[in-house]
Amino acid sequence: MHACAHHGAQSPQQRGSPAARRALADPRVRHFDLSGFELGCGRLLPVGASLAYKVHGPPIGQGAGIVLHPTSFDAVHNELEYQIGPGQTLDTARYTVIVPNLLGNGVSYSPSLIDPAAGLPPLFSVRDNVRAQRALLEHLGVGCSKEAPLDLVYGYSMGALQAYEWAVAWPESVRRIAAVCGAARCGELNRVFLGSIEAALKADAAWDAAAGRFTRPPTRGLAAFGSIYAGWGVGSSWYTEAEYARAGFASAEDFVERSYLPAFANCDADDLLSQIRTWRDADVAVHTGGDLRAALGRVRARVLLMPCDQDRYFTLGEAEREAALLGDRCVFRPIVSAAGHRAGDPHRPELGAEATWIRRHVYELLAE
């Protein structure tokens, strides 16, 4: 496996979301070759499969610390840049920040980047993603060893699932993780949420159950997907206390219509399903026969847990239980916000307080 500078060479017929296409066109994105990479299910990735990534800050090997920032659900690397840079949450005055794209997100190897006739990719597990990231870092000369561990793995949502996987699978390879609005595994309530948005997509006539893919963009299915997501992605008081007005929306209906529906309207549905499968499968306890206590007992990193008190699927209660299992290895700093899950991705102007809270505690973690 090796790095290559091509853009989208793994696709004879690119579809993908507009965001993914913009990310692929980024002149600084690079692709690490995953040809022949063995997935956990035993399947080998085909020739041309790659892990897309971008490096920010000082060149690797010049003495700066290393931060890994994996992407989250339906996010691509350039959408995370609002918190990367000098003086930002991930400060490139002090750290080199490496952002790998999730397999299935339309930038790394994904359904939208292959000919559907070739067959859609199987499950990309969180473990598969982290193993690919480790191979990338080793190629880049980042040791990920007990002698030279990563300074931080920072992850929001599905990125937090990956951060936890790093800490459990390779306890000596990372000094710290920050898990923002995420968890060590996908819980039962979370699975119910994922099942509902998956069912919304597949209810569209464009879904070909026999082939296991969409024959055309499922316009109605994507609208239903966005409508359901709007009930889960923010906290209950976002609606009951009309917090949406702070963000410039006239009503709850206006918020859904102008925020959630367009957010998913042009997504590639096959890529969404791939990422849903990755998310639903996530569980660090796979390393310990299903025992979460034992899995978290493997963690040697300092762990910053930042759930949102109103997150409706990565819940505060689950984070509290994980914090208790981690004990004094954990710094527990909940975000108090009506924005719910969105609070952990504070790129919107109305989330300035949430952004400041996250930055403050990441800085404190890195100072330890």
Residue ranges and their predicted role:
Residues V299, L305-P307:
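Short beta-strand/loop motif that positions the catalytic acidic residue
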Residues R329-E368:
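Catalytic active-site module of serine/aspartate enzymes centered on a nucleophile-bearing elbow/loop
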Residues R127-D151:
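Conserved acidic catalytic loop of the alpha/beta-hydrolase fold
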Residues K54-I114:
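N-terminal cap/lid subdomain of alpha/beta-hydrolase-fold enzymes
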Residues A282, D309-F314:
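Acidic catalytic loop of the alpha/beta-hydrolase fold
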Residues Q88-A135, N190-R191, G195-K202, A339-G340:
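Cap/lid segment of the alpha/beta-hydrolase catalytic domain
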Residues S173-V174, A179-P262:
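Alpha/beta-hydrolase-fold enzymes
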Residues T288-L292, A301, R312-L325:
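Short alpha-helix in the alpha/beta-hydrolase fold that links the catalytic acid
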